[in-house]
Amino acid sequence: GVIGLGAIGVLVANAASELGMEVFGCDPYLSIQNAVRLSHHITIVKDNDEIYNQCDYITIHVPALDSTKGMLNKRTFDQMKDGVKILNFARDILVNDADMADALANGKVSRYVTDFPNPAVVNMPGALVLPHLGASTEESEENCAVMAVNQIMDYLENGNIENSVNYPSCSLGYRKKTARICVCHYNRPNVISQLTSLFGEAGVNISDMVSKSRGEYAYAMFDVE
């Protein structure tokens, strides 16, 4: 079971499916872009409880938010199969360490694999703790810095968004000689139709446009003449 079908979660789900596993995935904010990349062999379920109830292996790939802090805890462990294996390479605070220690001790969880070592986790019987590398090397830090600068420049010069925390990835490519208008808005019905009506009333022609949404936020780009 894969909880969180973002860029990494989709890759994990597809890889597990290619290994011959029956894969369940859950993500209430699954983007169209990631849905297209997801193998058709993956079963999408409506909530995490279905994964807790059915899966022998559970891996989490969600951000650290108030709503996800300690999401794996005694209540959710009690829903899982006996002997479940859990993988956490996302964020350390997603797992309640004390409840995980109890679940490992009583056999509810047979193995906990993570790359977030701390004194509690490294002393848990049944925990397989790996080094957390991330962007710790000099080369990766430099690459991350260059990538961040390029993405900020692309937004400032062209209005394109990539790898935003709250907004969807959205691009119209390089800005042409025409003007480009970018609108950040809540993901509500009829916003795009209202915007295009305003352009029409002002006698502005739309030569190209794109609109993407992610959760409660959306982003629209218009090339106008």
Which ranges hold each PLM region?
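Conserved acidic E/D residue at the C-terminus of a beta-strand in Rossmann-like folds
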Residues: 27
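Residues at the starts of beta-strands that form the adenosine-phosphate
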Residues: 21-22
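Rossmann-like adenosine-cofactor binding region
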Residues: 30-121, 136
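N-terminal Rossmann-fold NAD(P) dinucleotide-binding loop
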Residues: 9-10
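NAD(P)-dependent dehydrogenase/reductase Rossmann-like domain
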Residues: 112, 122-125, 133-225
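Glycine-rich Rossmann-fold phosphate-binding loop(s) that bind the pyrophosphate
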Residues: 5-6
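Hydrophobic Val/Ile/Leu positions in short beta-strands of Rossmann-like dinucleotide-binding domains
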Residues: 1-2, 183
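Aromatic pocket-lining residues of Rossmann-like dinucleotide-binding sites
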Residues: 15-16, 80
